[in-house]
From Swiss-Prot:
Encoding gene per record: mtrB
Phosphohistidine modifications at: H305
Enzyme class name: transferase
Signal peptide: none
GO cellular component, as recorded: plasma membrane
Source domain of life: Bacteria
Organism of derivation: Mycolicibacterium paratuberculosis (strain ATCC BAA-968 / K-10)
Designated name of the protein: Sensor histidine kinase MtrB
Biased composition (Basic and acidic residues): 550-565
Stated role: Member of the two-component regulatory system MtrA/MtrB. Seems to function as a membrane-associated protein kinase that phosphorylates MtrA in response to environmental signals.
Gene3D superfamilies: 1.10.287.130, 6.10.340.10, Histidine kinase-like ATPase, C-terminal domain
Length: 565
């Protein structure tokens, strides 16, 4: 039972206890506020430095006051003991018939009785007297007063014939606390007579405590005033900076008319004017760029529409000539075939330009229906399969055994897949192209993997640029226009999906399309890894990464790739 109780106690108040978690939360909150608030740092640093200065000054001033008060006390005590020596000498030397003990007691009573009078006490204040004649051989010491309160070190000086003083804590009938003890040899006929005066430091201690309390109170008030001053001063700087930050955020959101108010002619006013000048320049340039972009989009759209009419006429004439190409000279027949092929490519380019202009104008719309994406993949393969056959490239397809129903625009998704497969065929270098599909509860992914030339670092983003080509000298077998991947990524975004690329020179490349199964949902993960898992060489031989150990490595890589998503 006892061990169980200890375990429960550690569980409650240990590292994972509520107190520790609460302290951790407070620490994180303070750290966050310290990092994010310039005003907090300024006020805290001002208070810290001010506190250090006040403590240093307080220590110096307190030391000076203490030393001054004690110096005055010592000076008055020395004057008092000089007068006491004369009094003691007169009493001890007055009547020889009196015993030594009686003489010492009479002298002590005479000295202490004078302290009851303000005029007799002088500036040294009240005191108690101690008189002592050390013993000599069998004769015991003769004393008067609390001799046990006199420090032995002070007695050593007095025995040597020197006047001295020492601070000590005394405990007498009338006082208990710090005191100043002054000792001196007495001038009398009695040999080795020692005189000590004990001056309580009660009043001096009260004076010093009053000074310390006053300084502490004054320091606390000064700290509060300095905190308020630092807060007001820092606010004069922080408020315009915060205003500039808020206006910059609104400016970045598209509110191009936002400006900072200009007040006065100081540094903050110059900052506001510079910010407004910058905002005005950026607003003007952004407006110009928007106008140029709109003009470019209108030009592309208008040219595409205007070219469609003459293209239709030329197409009709070319088809008519092509239908009678058998009756023409072989040279003319070949020219007719080339003309028809180029017209097909030109018509495809116009269609792509029109599609791009729709995306740029934000008028592209989805025609969503619930379909089995496996049939969409098969349809895309049937459209570009002849390209693989002509190039002697094997298409390896892995599709799920069960239906993959998704709410998509079939035409756009098929166009994405068609572009990806055609692009892979163009860069496969006569090696197989692998198409895989996988789905989870929320998303579906299709990867198109080739083992051709691959991509250099940084080209994963460039491949989706318009008219971009990694190698301009490479011939497109698919007859593409250079806009296929640019349109594909726009179609993927229209579905709130993702289209990503990966590649390494000489290893190949992989394109992954990830779409939500339900329209309107966002893609956060993908059921297929981006970086392909090492596979056996497409040429038919075994790659170096074979064997049981490498199989385990591939499994770990697959797990790591899926977790990284």
């Amino acid at each position: 039972m006892m061990w169980g109780s200890r375990r429960r106690t550690r569980s409650r108040w240990g590292r994972s206890g509520p107190m520790t978690r609460g302290m951790g939360a407070v620490s994180r909150a303070v750290g966050t506020a310290w990092r994010r608030s310039l005003q907090l740092r300024v006020v805290a640093l001002t208070l810290g430095l001010s506190l250090a200065v006040i403590l240093a000054l307080g220590f110096v001033l307190t030391s000076q006051v203490t030393n001054r008060v004690l110096d005055v006390k010592v000076k008055a005590a020395i004057e008092q003991i000089e007068r006491a020596r004369t009094t003691v000498g007169g009493i001890v030397n007055g009547e020889e018939a009196r015993s030594l003990d009686s003489s010492l007691q009479l002298a002590r009573n005479t000295l202490t009785s004078k302290t009851d009078s303000a005029s007799g006490a002088g500036t040294a204040g009240t005191f108690d007297a101690v008189l002592m004649v050390p013993g000599d051989g069998p004769r015991a010491a003769t004393t008067a007063g609390p001799v046990d309160q006199v420090p032995a070190s002070l007695r050593g000086f007095v025995k040597a014939g020197q006047a001295s003083y020492q601070y000590a804590t005394v405990h007498t009938d009338g006082f208990s606390g710090p005191a100043l003890i002054v000792g001196s040899p007495a001038s009398s006929q009695v040999a080795n007579l020692e005189l000590y005066l004990i001056f309580p430091l009660k009043n001096e201690q009260a004076t010093i405590q009053l000074v310390r309390g006053t300084m502490i109170t004054g320091g606390a008030v000064l700290l509060v005033l300095l905190a308020g001053i630092a807060l007001l001063v820092s606010r004069q700087v922080v408020v315009p900076v915060r205003s500039a930050s808020r206006i910059a955020e609104r400016f970045a959101e598209g509110h191009l008319s936002e400006r900072m108010p200009v007040r006065g002619e100081d540094d903050m006013a110059r900052l506001a004017m510079s910010f407004n000048d910058m905002a005005e320049s950026l607003s003007r340039q952004i407006t110009q760029l928007e106008e140029f972009g709109n003009l470019q989009r209108r030009f592309t759209s208008d040219v595409s529409h205007e070219l469609r009419t003459p293209l239709t006429t030329v197409r009709m004439a070319a088809d008519l000539i092509y239908d009678h190409s058998a009756d023409l000279d072989p040279t003319l027949a070949r020219s007719t075939e080339l003309m028809v092929n180029e017209l097909d490519r030109f018509e495809s380019l116009l269609n792509d330009l029109l599609e791009i202009s729709r995306h740029d104008a934000g008028v592209a719309e989805l025609s969503v229906e619930a379909v089995d994406l496996r049939s969409t993949v098969q349809s895309a393969l049937s459209n570009v399969g002849h390209l693989a056959e002509d190039a002697g490239i094997e298409l390896q397809v892995e599709l799920p055994a069960e239906e993959v129903i998704a709410e998509v625009d079939t035409r756009r998704v098929e166009r994405i897949l068609r572009n990806l497969i055609a692009n892979a065929i163009d860069h496969a270098e006569h090696k197989p192209v692998k198409i895989r599909m996988a789905a989870d509860e929320d998303t579906v992914a299709v990867t198109v993997r080739d083992y051709g030339v691959g991509l250099r670092p940084g080209e994963e983003k460039l491949v989706f640029s318009r008219f971009w080509r990694a190698d301009p000298s490479r011939v497109r077998r698919s007859g593409g226009t250079g806009l296929g991947l640019a349109i594909s990524i726009e179609d993927a975004r229209l579905h709130q999906g993702r289209l990503e690329a990966w590649g390494e020179p000489g290893v190949g490349s992989c394109f992954r399309l990830t779409l939500p199964l339900v329209r309107g949902h966002k893609v956060t993960t993908s059921p297929l890894p981006m970086k392909p898992i090492p596979q056996p060489s497409p040429s038919g031989g075994q790659s170096p990464s074979t064997g049981p150990q490498h199989a385990k490595d591939r499994a770990r890589q697959r797990e790591h790739a899926e977790r990284s998503l």
